[in-house]
């Protein structure tokens, strides 16, 4: 082919080349057209290259977008391949939409059958409703196709599909499973998809877009290994069959399998990709210190040759080479430790000698040849002791092992339920097990009953019309519909939470004593016949058999899935004796004198039925607390499922071939059948007299006759005390039920779920006899978060009185691990002054000694964790014990998080010295006693507890009290290590045995709203106001530190929500503002739980529905808001309506005639012309105040020819610097620019990853810039001829003064002339290049710009009007900025922001460097300018706008629901934004400053933007500016040319009519009326009514000779028209870089 190509390239004849191109096009065109079917999407280069490597043709002109286009193309290609394999007749399509047929190239005439099933919620919208089936069965075609669903199904379901479809022979199935997930490797094709791994499975993310991701358990990867499935009948009624799997095609993670119902040959290996990876040998010890992950062999060879080609390789050289050979796009595929191990391996290899240490054969004499074997043997013997030489070590280290993704297929076995059994079960409404028994009887006794008899129509019942059957049964006729609960069933009345979770705190000393074995009468002989010739699974010390009622029931022991065996009738008989349901039974035969492994049922999906354990021999059950329960033969016990979820047991026996059975009720798989009819239940027992109390009371109708009793539903036989969740009380009419004293203890135990904990509640000061309801309707449990922990003895240093005190409240010592890493983090922050106040002031020697003492391993210390809500008395018992101590005690030290809490302890224990109570920093510096009490430890810095315990080695016992529901410590310094540590409550909560959810502080109403139990009587009083309580020292709680400081300065006793922990007050004030909605539940719980019975809410925020909705989203605060509203509603409803008539509203009137003249107040303030002009000794006065007309003199007329104004503008607006100084400033402020961009990116919703460069969009932007420039008048092009020259310096600026009338409202009638504005004219090529960059970045920005941000660029006033009406919120003050010297203040930080933004959008590096160059070296005739914004540099407007956005995003907290408008240096927000605390440090490093203004958004005080006033009715022009501009145009005789433009702007206010009365004050209304009158006099009424659709008015051509300056203007214009104009040809500049895609030359 190369010779053919070379021959074609030698052809130079244009006609022949044209003919060849046309011939090639005829071949290419149909290919491209066909490729659009599978690939209609626009692809990146990497995606297109990857697809072409798969043999998939892509169309480079496709323009559709998709979140995962490449993976979608592969899916379409797979469908095409499937279509090639399918025959041209009807087939069945499973899990496929009809619209996919076009990708398979199949016509509708084939009449394919579609069968789908709803598995996920999105399937409800994916498939056509007429194709949905409740069960996939009865496939009538020989061939079927299953689309991308096989990996979500189990092997059992596929086997069942073939069994239920006898005609089905071949199944084509596609799966989406990345083979690299078998090894937990990164994606083989990162441009197509990525993979996230977790403990439960992995996430397949096509197109790296989370919206299309799928989660797979690791077990689904077994589909890649399946070769054959041996299908066997679960009930042994029919012969099985074999399914053969063969991989037909593999494209990335998509694979196509053919499943044939036959035993066929398949390849021995299953190949997915070429082997290109190797694993490096292990050369270091331990094995984990080696580079164990596969590496590309090419990269490994590159590294080896580099290490051996460099004279002396250093560690840094190796890291540099690794960075060089790994592309930037692949860096995320490597882990840091992997790179380190890789570098160590090659550094080790580089240090070994590669010159052979063996002798050569050519120079050996006869003596050496004869003695060579001996010398070789001696050498090997010496190496056993001395070690191998470097060359041998090198060869061993270079034995790379190939790493392959190829698999060896595996055979599996799966069970199915025969079609006959399913049919019988459905016809007779019986379980599969019963149907299987019936089928066996049909086969064994065909004369007695045949299959046809079952299928025939049933005979009518002659007794159906009889009201009472002659022989009524004593029990319910159907088990499946109703069942009478037998009270003799194994209810766990003897098993309680106290006895199981905390056996030492109940009447039973151990778990074993709390269980009550019973006798069932079954022996080992009753089971032996069942397990003969049945497959068993070998486990530790035993053999196991798994009997299940369905193959869908999976039973697992010791992480091994047991082989299912069909249910035996003998097991159903045993269930009758035990009176418990079950669908699984595990039978175990233990070896003699052996003990089984610890049995853990927590991995099983056990339902709420108890688990029955039956022992058939002398058995001993051993529990975690070392207690034992002996069982005799035939005895059984019940375990509640809640207990099994947390505990394990072990089976021991001394008898030979001991047998035991465990009965369970388990759930099924995701796509399996439900177990409603597959659960074996015992026959119902007849109620006896002893059970009358358990029977429902029959209802009585109006006639007095008893109505039939309702059917009883089978309920879980579990005592209420072991329920892990609070019961939902549907019929509670009162929030509290108090048990009377006359009730017995048994009735108390029956009515209270926490009956076994009442004694503990009483020891904490509660009666514990009330049922209280939380705000959500749930029963409040006073004891929660119960854990079973192993106890350890108290240390000898703990006094006996403290031991008894803790035991009395059921707080026992446990072993707590103090992590040295947490202590080290706190120590590092102290050492480097990142946290702390007192400790950071310690000298360096103390800090060094402190750090040295903490350099140790984890320390285990004895301690007790006490958790409880506020006011529960967590520290009461400890304080009572401390009151008994002597004054000079040296036993205990109390550590508190705040001074307030320390003073509280000292007040309650005045007898003890003050040094016993320390704040947390003092506890580090000063010595501590052996017993440490950390009160409210959740507010201590992370790592401090560990640091104190490790620092004071004499500490042997610690007590931690706190509330894990309240706020925790917050580190304000993000650089501190402890800011990234888990909270202390997360570390120590697992060591707490229970949580006391009861309080003495809050009244019952308040506590119940917080979900807390309380017995304190009283009424909760809640009131709202917009102000605080004056002349009051009631504590005020505020959401932010800023508000707290402000309130404190005003004399209030203020605290933050999170910082009020430890406060208790009868009444509190809570300030609600916009920050409240962002507070967490912990913070609000802390805040609301401070009061006893009165709360005063202060609402300083808006009262809109959105605001209340946000506050109501907080569960705790919603309860108080609802309470307040209910009280207000009652007050309003109790007040009758006033009988007096109301006065009607006044009608809207037309605008009155405005007084004249309106501008006179401004004219009166004017002084003489000379006093207002700027004076220069060199050039005299400026000439900005022109004519003698006083109205014209209100406006400054800045002209380019005014030398005085020109030099005054240069002195004011420009700053002269040097390139070196500019570069220094740029480097010094890079960090600030980075912060600006990060805030900008967050506000503008930019993606997390950089955006690829789009060459096509760049070309479009370049064409727009070029067309805009060429569309200018020829005269303008000729005047700029010098700047079009390639000899014009790239960094030079031609400086001009901008000619303009100054019409800004704030500068109207300014007494002193202000400097003007400069126009900086760069080289034309420079302007067009960076104008292109600005347009490109503008287009890219719009893709991500959120809807609540409006940028007034390439928009119309109509767009702005729509935005204001739809997005702007006028119910709150607005926010605008008045920047000072905006252009001159854009320094190096802003330049870095622009550079980072350009890099983020992947602007070519040479363009960015060129932009930096002109910004740092911009020069005028006076020298190099400082870094600033110049008006003619190309991206002026866009850059100004972006810098304004970045500045505001960095300075203020701008929420997502804030409407924002930007244009250059003009901006406005529809809410007042709070300044960030971090801006205090940034403000000094930014030149740019601004003065925020806050319009109240009421009549006369609305926000302004680009000359428009934003009102609730829409935008209107500023009345004063509009009127003054019209008067100016009238005075200079230019009104006729500009009247239409002014009328179009005025129309937005004019069309509002009388509604303007609500938005304009009296003065503004006068200006507006006069402007409208002027427009009517100028015949612009049609424009005011119809807008731009009205035709322009033609004025008569008249000249006003008396108007100043008008005759000169007309003469000058006429003279210009007569001048002959030169034509200049603009040639494109050559492409200096070779990048033909960019239209301008780079530098």
From Swiss-Prot:
It catalyses: RNA(n) + a ribonucleoside 5'-triphosphate = RNA(n+1) + diphosphate; ATP + H2O = ADP + phosphate + H(+). Its EC number is 2.7.7.48, 3.6.4.13. Residues 59-224 form the Alphavirus-like MT domain. GO terms for molecular function: ATP binding; ATP hydrolysis activity; mRNA methyltransferase activity; RNA binding; RNA helicase activity; RNA-directed RNA polymerase activity. Residues 690-700 have a biased composition (Polar residues). Residues 997-1132 form the (+)RNA virus helicase C-terminal domain. Residues 1372-1479 form the RdRp catalytic domain. Residues 686-711, 1131-1155, 1587-1620 are annotated as: Disordered. ATP binds at residues 868-875. CDD domains: Alphaflexiviridae_RdRp. Residues 828-996 form the (+)RNA virus helicase ATP-binding domain. Keywords: ATP-binding, Helicase, Hydrolase, Multifunctional enzyme, Nucleotide-binding, Nucleotidyltransferase, RNA-directed RNA polymerase, Transferase, Viral RNA replication. Residues 1136-1155 have a biased composition (Low complexity). RNA replication. The central part of this protein possibly functions as an ATP-binding helicase. This is RNA replication protein. It comes from Narcissus mosaic virus (NMV).
């Amino acid at each position: 082919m190369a010779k053919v190509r070379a021959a074609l390239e030698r052809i130079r004849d244009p006609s022949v080349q044209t003919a060849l191109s046309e011939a090639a096009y005829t071949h290419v065109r149909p290919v491209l057209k066909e490729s659009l079917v599978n690939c209609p999407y626009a692809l990146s280069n990497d995606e297109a290259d990857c697809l072409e490597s798969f043999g998939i043709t892509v169309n480079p002109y496709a323009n559709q977008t998709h979140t995962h286009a490449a993976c979608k193309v592969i899916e379409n290609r797979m469908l095409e391949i499937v279509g090639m394999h399918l025959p041209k007749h009807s087939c069945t399509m499973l899990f496929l939409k009809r619209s996919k047929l076009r990708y398979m190239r199949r016509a509708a005439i084939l009449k394919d059958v579609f069968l789908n099933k709803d598995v996920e919620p999105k399937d409800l919208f994916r498939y056509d409703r007429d194709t949905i089936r409740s069960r996939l069965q009865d496939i009538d075609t020989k061939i079927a196709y299953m689309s991308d669903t096989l990996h979500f199904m189990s092997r059992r379901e596929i086997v069942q599909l073939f069994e239920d479809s006898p005609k089905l022979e071949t199944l084509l199935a596609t799966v989406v499973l990345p083979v690299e997930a078998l090894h937990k490797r990164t994606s083989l094709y990162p441009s197509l998809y990525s993979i996230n791994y977790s403990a439960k499975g992995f996430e397949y993310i096509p197109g790296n877009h989370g919206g299309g991701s799928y989660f797979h358990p690791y077990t689904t990867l077994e589909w890649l290994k399946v070769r054959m499935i041996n299908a066997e009948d679960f009930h042994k009624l029919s012969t099985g069959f074999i399914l053969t799997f063969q991989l037909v095609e593999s494209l990335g993670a998509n694979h196509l399998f053919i499943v044939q119902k036959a035993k066929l040959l398949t390849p021995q290996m299953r190949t997915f990709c070429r082997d290109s990876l190797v694993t490096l040998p292990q050369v270091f010890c331990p094995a984990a210190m080696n580079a164990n992950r596969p590496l590309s062999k090419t990269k490994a060879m590159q590294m080896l040759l580099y290490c051996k080609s460099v004279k002396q390789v250093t560690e840094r050289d190796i890291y540099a080479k690794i960075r060089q050979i790994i592309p930037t796009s692949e860096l995320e595929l490597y882990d840091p430790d992997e790179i380190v191990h890789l570098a160590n391996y090659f550094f080790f290899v580089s240090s070994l000698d590669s010159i052979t240490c063996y002798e050569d054969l050519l120079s050996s004499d006869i003596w050496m040849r004869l003695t060579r074997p001996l010398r070789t043997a001696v050498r090997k013997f010496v190496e056993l002791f001395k070690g191998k030489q470097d060359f041998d070590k090198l060869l061993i280290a270079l034995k790379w092992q190939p790493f392959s993704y190829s698999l060896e297929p595996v055979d599996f076995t799966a069970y199915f339920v025969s079609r006959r059994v399913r049919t019988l079960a459905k016809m007779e409404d019986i379980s599969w097990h019963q149907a299987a028994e019936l089928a066996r009887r049909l086969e064994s006794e065909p004369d007695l009953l045949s299959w046809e008899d079952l299928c025939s129509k049933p005979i009518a019942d002659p007794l159906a019309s009889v009201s009472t059957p002659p022989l009524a049964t004593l029990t319910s006729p159907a088990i499946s519909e109703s069942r009478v609960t037998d009270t003799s069933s194994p209810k766990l009345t003897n098993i309680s939470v106290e006895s199981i979770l905390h056996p030492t705190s109940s009447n039973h000393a151990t778990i074993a004593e709390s269980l009550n074995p019973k006798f069932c009468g079954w022996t080992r002989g009753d089971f032996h016949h069942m397990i003969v010739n049945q497959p068993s699974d070998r486990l530790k010390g035993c053999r196991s058999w798994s009997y299940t009622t369905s193959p869908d029931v999976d039973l697992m022991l010791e992480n091994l899935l047991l082989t299912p065996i069909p249910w035996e009738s003998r097991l159903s008989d045993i269930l009758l004796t035990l009176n418990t349901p079950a669908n699984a039974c595990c039978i175990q035969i233990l070896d003699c004198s052996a003990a089984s492994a610890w049995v853990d049922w927590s991995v099983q999906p056990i339902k709420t039925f108890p688990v029955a354990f039956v022992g058939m021999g002398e058995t001993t059950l051993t529990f975690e607390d070392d207690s034992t329960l002996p069982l005799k033969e035939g005895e059984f016990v019940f375990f509640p499922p809640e207990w099994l979820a947390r505990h394990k047991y072990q089976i021991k026996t001394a008898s030979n071939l001991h047998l035991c059975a465990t009965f369970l009720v388990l759930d099924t798989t995701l796509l399996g059948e439900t177990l409603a009819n597959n659960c074996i239940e015992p026959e119902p027992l007849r109620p006896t007299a002893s059970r009358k109390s358990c029977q429902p009371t029959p209802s009585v109708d109006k006639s007095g006759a008893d109505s039939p009793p309702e059917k009883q539903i089978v309920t879980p036989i579990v005592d209420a005390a072991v329920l892990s969740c609070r019961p939902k009380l549907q019929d509670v009419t009162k929030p509290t039920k108090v048990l009377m004293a006359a009730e017995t203890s048994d009735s108390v135990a029956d009515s209270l779920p926490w009956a076994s904990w009442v004694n503990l509640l009483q020891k904490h000061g509660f009666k514990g006899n009330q049922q209280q309801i939380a705000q959500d309707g749930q029963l409040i449990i006073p004891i929660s978060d119960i854990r079973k922990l192993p106890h350890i003895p108290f240390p000898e240093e703990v006094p006996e009185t403290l031991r008894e005190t803790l035991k009395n409240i059921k707080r026992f010592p446990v072993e707590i691990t103090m992590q040295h890493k947490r202590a080290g983090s706190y120590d590092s922050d102290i050492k480097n002054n990142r946290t702390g106040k007192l400790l950071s002031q310690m000298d360096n020697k103390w800090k060094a000694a402190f750090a040295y003492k903490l350099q140790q391993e984890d320390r285990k210390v004895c301690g007790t964790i006490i958790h409880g809500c506020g006011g529960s008395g967590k520290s009461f018992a400890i304080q009572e014990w401390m009151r008994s101590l002597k004054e000079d005690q040296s036993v205990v030290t109390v550590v508190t998080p705040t001074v307030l809490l320390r003073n509280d302890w000292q007040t309650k224990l005045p007898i003890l010295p003050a040094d016993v109570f320390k704040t947390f920093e003092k506890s580090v510096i000063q010595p501590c006693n052996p017993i440490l009490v950390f009160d409210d430890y959740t507010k201590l810095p992370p790592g401090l507890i560990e640091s104190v315990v490790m620092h004071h080695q004499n500490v042997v016992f610690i007590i931690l009290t706190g509330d894990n529901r309240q706020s925790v410590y917050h580190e304000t310094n993000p650089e501190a290590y402890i800011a990234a540590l888990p909270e202390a409550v997360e570390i120590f909560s697992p060591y707490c045995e229970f949580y006391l959810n009861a309080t003495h502080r809050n009244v019952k109403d308040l506590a119940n709203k917080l979900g807390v139990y309380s017995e304190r009587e009283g009424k909760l009083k809640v009131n709202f106001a917009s102000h605080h309580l004056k002349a009051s020292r009631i504590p005020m709680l505020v959401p932010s530190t800023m508000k707290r400081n402000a309130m404190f300065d005003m004399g209030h006793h203020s605290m933050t929500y999170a910082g009020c922990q430890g406060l208790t007050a009868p009444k509190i004030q809570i300030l609600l503002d916009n920050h409240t909605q962002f507070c967490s539940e912990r913070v609000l719980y802390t805040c609301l739980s401070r009061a006893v019975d009165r709360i005063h809410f202060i609402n300083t925020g808006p009262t809109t529905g959105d605001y209340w909705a946000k506050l109501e989203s907080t569960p705790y605060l919603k309860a108080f808001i609802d309470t307040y509203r209910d009280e207000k509603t009652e007050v309003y409803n109790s007040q009758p309506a006033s009988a007096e008539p109301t006065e009607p509203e006044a009608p809207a009137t037309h605008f009155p005639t405005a007084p004249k003249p309106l501008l006179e107040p401004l004219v009166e303030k004017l002084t003489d012309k000379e006093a207002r002009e700027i004076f220069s000794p060199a050039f005299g006065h400026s000439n900005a105040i022109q004519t003698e007309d006083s109205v014209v003199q209100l406006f400054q007329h800045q002209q380019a020819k005014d030398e005085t104004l020109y030099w005054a503008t240069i002195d004011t607006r420009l700053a002269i610097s040097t390139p070196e100084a500019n570069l220094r400033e740029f480097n010094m402020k890079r960090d600030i620019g980075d912060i600006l961009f990060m805030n900008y990116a967050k506000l503008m919703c930019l993606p997390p990853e950089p955006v690829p460069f789009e060459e096509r969009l760049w070309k479009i932007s370049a064409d727009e810039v070029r067309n805009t420039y060429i569309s200018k008048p020829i005269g303008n092009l000729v005047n700029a001829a010098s700047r079009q020259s390639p000899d014009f310096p790239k960094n030079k600026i031609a400086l001009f003064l901008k000619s303009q009338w100054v019409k800004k409202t704030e500068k109207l009638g300014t007494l002193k002339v202000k400097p003007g504005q400069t126009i900086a004219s760069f080289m034309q090529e420079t302007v067009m290049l960076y104008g292109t960059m600005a347009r490109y970045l503008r287009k890219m920005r719009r893709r991500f710009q959120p809807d609540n941000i409006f940028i007034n660029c390439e928009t119309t006033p109509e767009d702005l009007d729509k935005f204001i009406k739809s997005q702007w919120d006028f119910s709150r003050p607005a926010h605008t900025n008045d920047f000072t010297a905006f252009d001159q203040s854009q320094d190096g930080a802003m330049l870095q922001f622009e550079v980072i933004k350009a890099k983020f959008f992947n602007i070519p590096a040479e363009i960015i460097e060129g932009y930096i160059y002109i910004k740092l070296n911009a020069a005028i005739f006076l020298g190099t300018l400082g870094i600033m914004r110049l008006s003619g540099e190309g991206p002026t407007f866009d850059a100004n706008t972006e810098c304004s956005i970045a500045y505001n995003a960095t300075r203020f907290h701008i929420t997502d629901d804030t409407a924002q408008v930007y244009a250059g240096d003009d901006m406005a927000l529809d809410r007042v934004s709070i300044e960030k605390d971090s801006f205090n440090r940034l403000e000094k490093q930014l030149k740019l400053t601004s003065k925020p203004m806050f319009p109240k958004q009421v009549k006369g005080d609305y926000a302004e933007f680009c000359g428009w006033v934003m009102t609730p009715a829409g935008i209107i022009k500023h009345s004063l500016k509009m009127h003054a501009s019209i008067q100016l145009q009238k005075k200079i005789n230019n009104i006729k040319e500009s009247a239409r433009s002014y009328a179009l702007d005025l129309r937005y206010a004019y069309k509002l009519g009388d509604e303007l009365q609500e938005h304009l004050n009296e003065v503004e209304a006068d200006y507006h009326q006069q402007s409208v009158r002027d427009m009517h006099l100028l015949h612009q009424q049609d424009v005011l009514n119809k807008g731009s659709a009205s035709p322009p008015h033609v004025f008569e051509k008249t000249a006003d000779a008396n108007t100043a300056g008008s005759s000169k203007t007309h003469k000058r214009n006429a003279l210009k028209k007569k001048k002959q104009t030169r034509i200049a040809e603009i040639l494109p500049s050559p492409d200096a870089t070779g990048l033909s895609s960019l239209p301008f030359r780079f530098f």
